[in-house]
Structures are given as structure tokens and as C-alpha cells.
């Protein structure tokens, strides 16, 4: 069953993905890149967020894989591991890992099943290899979400779209947090700024996707929701490893007139990640799952936004990248306290979280932390 028709209520700000009006040159560029398609509008949340009976999160791509890690049950969470893909023939392939993140979400409610791909990792060979080994069928996807415009989360997208052309459902929704997602970026953590890429608008247009902006909270495939913009409401601060450029260069980048007025005149500026979104699920009898992907806006901020959007106070699990690797121990401990104060049942750090966070949590709150690797399957609910 396909996602519900997309609608958009007033009251939640929107910057159209597609450009309308403007100069003849800009209009021609938009038509060439986007095929003249109409803007897509996210189905906003009115009333209660969806509730599901069961949610399964599969880590498609993460930083590393430990083939000997055992499966089992941690608290009320079923944890499945993938070792070697053995058969009656010698194993020719294994799961690949890289500094990137991609997750697959499958939810059940009664007889309904929904499948969502969240982020695309760093490279398409890794993504395609792992999807095949893990048995994830692109034809079953009901939606895709791109959490933010960093290459280690969208780098595998174009190759994935081309490899699965004609195999996916037509007009598959791709949710993003806004036009800023398309801005060109440079990596600035080293001595010299280096190219960190930009989303390929032409490839996305050719893939027959419905690119859907969700600057506010939005329902995903009837079963899940995204937070929309994540306010900075706690001690957490953005420590950006990149800077972004507003403008179009050789068909890549973000349209200035689709950016907030205070961002339009910017050449290069530090990322504030106003476009970053988290994907969430309300599991019956358990509470919220919050998938932060990279957590540039702060993992505690993301959880608080999910709670505010849903009206739910119970947080069952927080999983994804928390972007704590660049921070010192005091900040890491403050983040742990913030999650403990929210009474989170399970914490599953991935990707850019860093080892200090895991080691402290494992030593002090071992029943809360779950170690995750590429291929790990986490089952929440009945």
C-alpha cells in the first residue's frame, strides 16, 4: 500500500523544493533540473502521531562490523547480528563498512507493513552490497528520508537510485528538511577546506521521486514521522565540521530565493543544520523510537522535539549518530545526563558518536546501552 496523498497544512513554514518565478535563466535551470514537476507538500501531523505494533531497525551501513558479535535479547529488545553470509559455497562477499550511516526501518500495524530507508551511507557500492546481503528489497520501500545534506549520509544515493530504477514504487517520496539540504558544502575540520559535495538534483529528478520538504513535523508512510526543524532548547551546541554555500554552481547547490532571508546573501558560512530532521516511531506499549542519524542539532534536542511533536513522554530508544566525537568528556557526560533525565530505556550509539560516550555509558549504565554494528537488527515491540 502506498503512502497517503501528500498534504500540507498552514502554520508550518515551507520553502518549496521547486523554484517558481524568478529570472528566465533561473527558470530554465529549474525546468532542466527538475523536469517541470510540481512542488510536493509533506503530510503534517494533526492530532496523535501514528502508533505501530512493532518496529525493526536494520543498520545497513555504519563505521564497522564485528562478525562474531552474538545475537540475543537485551532487555525487551531483540538484537540480531550478521556474521558471515555462509552457504554451501565459499563466502565471496561480506558486509562492508565505511564512515557513513544508512538504516532501514520496517514497521507493522495489524496487517500493514511499511518500509523506509533512512539515509544512504557514504558510497553506493557499500550500500548496494549490504542491501543485497541483508535481503532488503527496494521494491518494498514506501518512503525514503535524508536526514541532512552531508556526504556521509547521501553519498550512496545516486548510485542506489540508478541501480534500482524501475524496481522501486513509482513516485516514491523522498523526505528532506528543506532547501538547505541541497547547499554545496566544504569539510573544514582539516587545515584546508575540501569539497564535501552536494546533492545531485538532476539524478534525483531522473529517478522519478517525489521530493518532499518537511520543515515541520510530518507523517512518513502512515506509520512513522519526522521531527521537522529541531530547535536548540538545551545546553547542546552545533559544532560544525563543514561550511555551506548558498547559490547554484554548475547545476548543484541551493536556490537563494528558497532560503530564509537572512541566509540568502551568504557565500560560505558555518553549517547550523537548520534542515536536519530525525525519524521517529511510536511503538505501542513501549514509547518513542528516535533515530537521530547524525545529531548535529543535539541528540537531547532531537528527543525533546520528538516528545513535543508527539505529545508522548515515554522514550523507549534513541539510536543513531549523536555527533559527540569532537566534544570533550564533560560535554559527553552532560549529554548522557540529559538522556538519563529523559528516562530513555535504550541508547544505541552509532556512526559519529565516538567511543568515549559508549565506554562511559557501558561502565555506568550497562543496562541502557546497546552496541550496534553494520548489519545489526533491532526489534522493538511485540
State what each model feature region is.
Residues 1-13:
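N-terminal secretory signal peptides
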Residues 10, 20-35, 39-112, 226-275, ...:
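Zn-dependent metallo-beta-lactamase
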Residues 56-60, 116-119, 224-230, 288-294:
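Active-site-proximal beta-strand elements of phosphoester/diester hydrolases
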Residues 62-63, 120-122, 149, 179-180, ...:
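Active-site metal-binding loops of divalent metal-dependent hydrolases
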Residues 91-99, 107-143, 158-159, 166, ...:
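Pre-active-site segment of Zn-dependent metallo-hydrolases
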Residues 105, 119, 131, 148, ...:
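Divalent metal-coordination and catalytic microenvironments
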Residues 142-215, 228-239, 340-346:
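Active-site HxH/HxHxD metal-binding segment of metal-dependent hydrolases
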Residues 143, 150-154, 173, 258-376:
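Cap/insert and terminal regions of metallo-dependent hydrolase folds
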Amino acid at each position: 500500500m502506498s503512502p497517503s496523498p501528500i498534504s500540507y497544512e498552514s502554520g508550518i513554514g515551507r520553502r518549496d523544493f521547486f523554484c517558481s518565478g524568478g529570472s528566465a535563466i533561473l527558470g530554465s535551470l529549474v525546468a532542466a533540473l527538475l523536469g517541470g514537476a510540481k512542488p510536493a507538500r509533506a503530510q503534517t501531523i494533526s492530532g496523535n502521531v501514528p502508533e505501530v505494533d512493532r518496529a525493526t531497525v536494520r543498520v545497513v551501513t555504519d563505521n564497522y562490523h564485528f562478525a562474531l558479535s552474538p545475537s540475543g535479547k537485551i532487555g525487551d529488545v531483540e538484537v540480531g547480528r550478521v556474521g558471515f553470509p555462509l552457504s554451501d559455497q565459499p563466502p565471496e562477499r561480506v558486509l562492508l563498512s565505511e564512515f557513513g550511516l544508512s538504516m532501514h526501518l520496517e514497521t507493522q500495524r495489524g496487517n500493514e507493513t511499511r518500509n523506509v530507508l533512512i539515509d544512504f551511507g557514504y558510497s553506493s557500492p557499500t550500500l548496494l552490497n549490504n542491501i543485497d546481503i541483508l535481503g532488503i528489497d527496494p521494491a518494498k520501500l514506501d518512503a525514503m528520508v535524508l536526514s541532512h545534506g552531508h556526504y556521509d549520509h547521501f553519498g550512496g544515493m545516486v548510485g542506489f537510485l540508478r541501480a534500482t530504477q524501475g524496481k522501486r514504487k513509482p513516485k516514491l517520496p523522498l523526505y528532506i528538511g528543506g532547501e538547505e539540504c541541497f547547499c554545496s558544502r566544504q569539510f573544514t575540520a582539516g587545515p584546508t577546506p575540501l569539497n564535501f559535495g552536494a546533492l545531485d538534483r538532476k539524478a534525483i529528478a531522473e529517478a522519478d521521486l517525489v521530493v518532499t520538504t518537511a520543515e515541520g513535523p510530518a507523517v512518513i508512510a502512515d506509520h512513522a514521522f519526522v521531527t521537522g526543524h529541531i530547535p536548540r532548547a538545551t545546553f547542546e551546541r552545533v559544532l560544525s565540521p563543514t561550511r555551506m554555500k548558498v547559490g547554484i554552481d554548475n547545476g548543484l547547490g541551493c536556490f537563494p530565493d528558497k532560503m530564509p532571508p537572512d541566509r540568502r546573501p551568504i557565500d560560505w558560512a558555518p553549517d547550523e543544520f537548520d534542515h536536519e530532521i530525525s525519524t521517529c516511531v511510536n511503538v505501542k506499549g513501549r514509547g518513542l523510537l528516535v533515530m537521530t542519524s547524525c545529531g548535529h542539532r543535539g541528540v537531547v534536542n532531537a528527543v525533546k522535539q520528538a516528545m513535543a511533536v508527539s505529545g508522548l513522554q515515554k522514550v523507549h530508544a534513541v539510536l543513531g549518530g549523536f555527533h559527540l566525537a569532537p566534544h570533550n568528556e564533560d560535554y559527553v557526560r552532560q549529554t548522557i545526563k540529559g538522556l538519563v533525565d529523559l528516562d530513555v530505556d535504550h541508547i544505541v550509539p552509532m556512526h559519529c558518536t565516538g567511543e568515549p560516550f559508549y565506554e562511559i555509558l557501558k561502565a555506568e549504565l550497562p543496562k541502557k546501552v546497546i552496541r550496534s554494528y553494520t548489519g545489526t537488527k533491532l526489534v522493538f515491540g511485540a
